[in-house]
Swiss-Prot record:
Organism lineage: Bacteria, Bacillati, Chloroflexota, Chloroflexia, Chloroflexales
Claim: Hydrolase is one of the keywords in the record: yes
Main EC class the enzyme belongs to: hydrolase
Gene3D superfamilies cross-referenced by the UniProt entry: 3.30.230.10
EC number: 3.1.26.5
Function: RNaseP catalyzes the removal of the 5'-leader sequence from pre-tRNA to produce the mature 5'-terminus. It can also cleave other RNA substrates such as 4.5S RNA. The protein component plays an auxiliary but essential role in vivo by binding to the 5'-leader sequence and broadening the substrate specificity of the ribozyme.
Name of the protein this chain belongs to: Ribonuclease P protein component
Subunit and interaction comment: Consists of a catalytic RNA component (M1 or rnpB) and a protein subunit.
Family according to the record: Belongs to the RnpA family.
NCBIfam families to which the protein is assigned, alphabetical: rnpA
InterPro entries: Ribosomal_Su5_D2-typ_SF, Ribsml_uS5_D2-typ_fold_subgr, RNase_P, RNase_P_CS
UniProt keyword annotations, A-Z: Endonuclease, Hydrolase, Nuclease, RNA-binding, tRNA processing
Segments of this protein annotated with the region Disordered: 115-135
């Protein structure tokens, strides 16, 4: 995720937590606050109860990638804070994780395009011939 799309300073995280509106799912909590007009900035939080550093970093990387794929379809002008609540995020299929994030973003009315299914990180041409859908 590009530097311009990240919350980086503790004061930025604090402002979003204090002034934002919260949406929850079984795996994540999304806090949304008005931000800069020219884009969307995202922050990711994992607590120690999620596991040791390796597990926390892996959970953060997976959620960050799922959000990065959705950035072009998000409404600009907001700061988003994703708090990872469950260790299931680490082992869950990526498509389920992405569907959970889409559900939260829809609750917050932040998707500009109606998404019918999660964005796939794999292009259809990179799949084996027998797994490709017919045109």
């Amino acid at each position: 995720m590009r530097r311009a799309n990240r919350l980086r300073r503790p004061a930025q995280f604090r402002r979003v937590r204090q002034t934002g509106r919260t949406f929850s799912s079984a795996w994540l909590t999304l806090t949304v606050a008005p931000g800069r007009r020219d884009g969307v900035r995202c922050g990711f939080i994992t607590g120690r109860r999620l596991g040791k550093a390796v597990q926390r970093n892996r959970a953060r990387r997976r959620v960050r990638e799922a959000v990065r794929l959705l950035l072009p379809s998000l409404t600009t002008g907001y700061d988003l804070l994703f708090a990872i609540r469950s260790p299931e995020v680490i082992e869950a299929p990526f498509s389920q994780l992405q569907a959970d994030i889409i559900r939260l973003l829809r609750q917050a009315c932040l998707l500009t395009t109606p998404e019918t299914e999660p964005v796939s990180p794999v292009s259809p041409t990179s799949l084996p011939q027998n797994e490709r859908g017919s045109p």
